Amino acid sequence: MFLGTLVPFLFVLTVVVFVHEMGHYLVGRWCGIGVRAFSIGFGPELIGFNDRHGTRWKLCAIPLGGYVKFVGDMNATSSQPTSEELETLTDEERKVAFHTQAIWKRAATVVAGPLFNFLLTIVVFSVLFASYGRYVAEPMVAEVTADSPAAKAGIQPGDRFVSVDGSKVETFGDVQRLVSGRAGDTITFVMLRDGKEVTVTATPQLMEQQDALGNKVKVAVIGVVNNKELGQPRLITYTPVGAVAAAVEETGHVIQRTGQFLQRFAVGREDKCQLGGPVKIADMAGKAAKLGFEWLVQLVALLSVGIGFLNLLPIPPLDGGHLLFYGVEAVIRRPVSERMMEMAYRAGLLLVLCFMGFVFWNDLFGC
């Protein structure tokens, strides 16, 4: 049982971290930046080797992340070295040091990590869509739950969803996607009834459901049901190009939902138990592996978006924090002062550690 959870968890996390760090590495090398180390994991090195460029590739004992250490980096977070630390570099090292490069090279190298995460998700979805296709159903209402938001809004069996808050819908899944993350929001629905469009408003409410992995999740619903007779479920098959286009669209939806969730979570409008850390991810990986490899790679795709999105938040020492400093540097035309950088990194690191502590607490005791 333990290995049945641990092995899938390590697979999922290692793939996501490797792709993220490979983004930093490849773009950094393309920009002419020297790389001292590429590490999967933290702590003591388990195995490793040096390549012909002098980069140390290694696997470390604590598999909860990874890093690329560029020439000039004084730690794994690529924080700005002090002037005294830069003086310890040789002239050759200064030429390829990360922090001596043009702003656009540093920004491109930093943003490449999250972008590679998004690309990984697109690749996974593309392969899944091309291999298995996708089942969809017409956006029809077969039943309306009594006393539900839909019933109070006047939605009736036989109605067809046309749009949700101005977004056109083509499938019942589109309706679920646009509603599921908006509990407590007043949403405008345009329905097609007897050949005429009818506009109604409803406020979704949270309902606890079980997802495909058996986890209890809370999603916003309005209380409508689709069925085979009205929904007419069908399998959509894709050409390779069509699969990529659908994957890009689906990845965009996942990114949008992730941002929407974090925004609502920050103001207390989401259940704290919906946010988990390594323990929850490990549990999900174990369950996904039991259902089949395609479920495991779907988890890779979803986690990859989450890691990419979180890293873009403008908080030092995350990638987004670095990008924020580069933006300020571009505006004021000089690097941010060492004192300001140090204060920002300390505050950001404290915030990140508090967040990590929160999700660990959720995993072990809170939920």
Swiss-Prot record:
PANTHER family: MEMBRANE METALLOPROTEASE ARASP2, CHLOROPLASTIC-RELATED, REGULATOR OF SIGMA-E PROTEASE RSEP. The chain crosses the membrane at residues 108-130, 291-313, 343-365. It comes from Mesorhizobium japonicum (strain LMG 29417 / CECT 9101 / MAFF 303099) (Mesorhizobium loti (strain MAFF 303099)). One of its GO terms (cellular component) is plasma membrane. Belongs to the peptidase M50B family. The active site is at E21. One of its GO terms (molecular function) is metalloendopeptidase activity. Its cofactor is Zn(2+). This is Putative zinc metalloprotease mll0638. It is found in: Cell inner membrane. Residues 121-196 form the PDZ domain. It is a multi-pass membrane protein. The keyword Amino-acid biosynthesis does not apply. GO terms for biological process: proteolysis. Zn(2+) binds at H20, H24. Its EC number is 3.4.24.-. The lineage of its organism: Bacteria, Pseudomonadati, Pseudomonadota, Alphaproteobacteria, Hyphomicrobiales. It is an enzyme of class 3 (hydrolase). SUPFAM superfamilies: PDZ domain-like. It comes from the Bacteria. Keywords: Cell inner membrane, Cell membrane, Hydrolase, Membrane, Metal-binding, Metalloprotease, Protease, Transmembrane, Transmembrane helix, Zinc.
